[in-house]
Curated annotation (Swiss-Prot):
Name of protein: tRNA N6-adenosine threonylcarbamoyltransferase
Cited CDD domains: ASKHA_NBD_TsaD_bac
Subcellular localization, as worded in the UniProt entry: Cytoplasm
Single GO biological process annotation from the record: tRNA threonylcarbamoyladenosine modification
Residues that, per the record, bind Fe cation: H115, H119, D304
Record keyword Cytoplasm present: yes
Function description: Required for the formation of a threonylcarbamoyl group on adenosine at position 37 (t(6)A37) in tRNAs that read codons beginning with adenine. Is involved in the transfer of the threonylcarbamoyl moiety of threonylcarbamoyl-AMP (TC-AMP) to the N6 group of A37, together with TsaE and TsaB. TsaD likely plays a direct catalytic role in this reaction.
Keywords, alphabetical: Acyltransferase, Cytoplasm, Iron, Metal-binding, Transferase, tRNA processing
PANTHER family from the UniProt entry: TRNA N6-ADENOSINE THREONYLCARBAMOYLTRANSFERASE, TRNA N6-ADENOSINE THREONYLCARBAMOYLTRANSFERASE, MITOCHONDRIAL
Organism, scientific name: Xanthomonas campestris pv. campestris (strain ATCC 33913 / DSM 3586 / NCPPB 528 / LMG 568 / P 25)
Amino acid sequence: MKVLGIESSCDETGVAVYDTALSGVPALRAHAVYSQIALHAEYGGVVPELASRDHVRKLLPLIRQTLDEAGLRIDELDGVAYTAGPGLVGALLVGAGVARALAWALEVPAIGVHHMEGHLLAPLMEDDPPQPPFVALLVSGGHTQLVSVKALGAYEVLGETLDDAAGEAFDKTAKMMGLPYPGGPQLAALAETGTPGRYKFARPMTDRPGLDFSFSGLKTQVLLAWRGSDQSDTTRADIARGFEDAVVETLAIKCLRALDTADCNTLVVAGGVGANKRLRARLQEAAQRRGGRVCFPRPALCTDNGAMIAFAGALRLEAGEHADAAVQVTPRWDMASLPPLAAARESGIGNRES
């Protein structure tokens, strides 16, 4: 089954083709992402109406480009998957409308995909994918969650942020220190040059039981340290390093607790912050110490993309799910409410070859 995936939940337009007849990395026939960073930079954040209009402009050309790269005609598609939520309602409707129209014209099934399930399943597109049960850390600009995955589609949220997501904290902290938009990647790059230990910030909510997160207090700590400093380039880098170390260590501590809670030894990390080099290294080290395994998608598939939507959609279409003809989106959507994917798992998609 060749499935077209469309991602338009926020400020990236993503399109991909996933082929279930193949396995591992080659199954992703083609994917392309258009980022709206330049469009929103002057506003210091995403403007929903501008995001929606830009998806309208970019989506169809990106579909044509992706099909060309995959070497496919549009009538060779067997299904269409699109992000149905969570996300910005206008942006979601653009992708959903195009997807439903294509599916109707091609007389193929369509499926709305949960954006965070797409992130969670992205590592399964790699060679030697992880198998349930595992714990997933979903860490991005809008979400920070620990999820127990007992089977594909069977999700239990073990903990989540009570305020800012980790990626949001990166972006806001960077903005406080005068770094350009988008701040998170800029702050991480700056932290590479900072002196470890010069600034040491609290590891929020690690001194008590539980798996929830809170990053708003850490953000305030950094603001006070910045305002009380000489605000030199060197100090900016040192504070960035201290902030990043605090976030990474907090995430690592909570991940290890979650593995103990779920009684498993495999950790999956996905979402934009999952591309952070220091986070990857720290979690790899922690997994090796306990004789476990940590799995990441390739960095290009950590941020929002159509590949994860095509893959998650392929799993659900193979399981016999499909959407009706209505164009529906769900801006707020609890992933735990999704139906299990036992049939898709039995089909072998995303499983190791025997």
